[in-house]
Amino acid sequence: MKFFKFKKTNVVSLINFTGIIAPNMGRKKGLNIQDYNKLIEQAFQNKRNKAVVLVINSPGGSPVQSEFLADRIINLSKEKNIPVITFVEDVAASGGYWLACAADEIFASKASIIGSIGVISAGFGFDKALNKIGVDRRIYTAGKNKSLLDPFSPENKDDIKRLKNLQTKLHEHFISFITLRRGKK
C-alpha cells in the first residue's frame, strides 16, 4: 500500500453576484440575502481561507437587499478575520457598488462602470389617458398615504414631497456607508 502526503494549501473562496439586486418575487429571482446568506456563510467557513472574493456584475437594485448582503459580508469578515476583495466585471452601479464596498479592496477594468451613488424612483401617469377615454378612477382607503403616487391619479404635491424626503434620507445613508467603507479612495 502506498501513502501520499498532501500538503494543505491556502484557499480563496469566490462568490459571484451577477444580476439585479432584488427580493424574490414569485418566479423572478434576484440577488438577495435569502438566496445568498448560506453561500456567504460557506465562503467564510474554511479555516484555511485567506480571502473571500466577490465577483460583481450588477447594475444595482434594491437598497435594502444591497445593505443586507453587504452587512452580512462585512460582519463575517470581521468575525472570521478574513479579508474581502471585490472584482468588478462590467458594472457595479448603485446597489452593485454598495455591495462592492463590502470589500476591503476593489479591483476593476478601466472599462468597468463603477459608482452611481444615487436613488431613483420611476413611474407613469395614466390619469390623462383615462380621462380621455372616459374612465374614472375610484380609490377607497383607510389611513394616510395608502395610494401614494397612484399612476392612475393626478400627481399630488404632498406625495412628491414625501417621496423626495424618503429619497434624500436614503441617498444620505448611501453616501455615509460609502464614505465609511471607502474614505478618500
Which residues does each PLM region occupy?
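Small-residue-centered hinge/linker elements
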Residues: 1-81, 91-98, 103-184
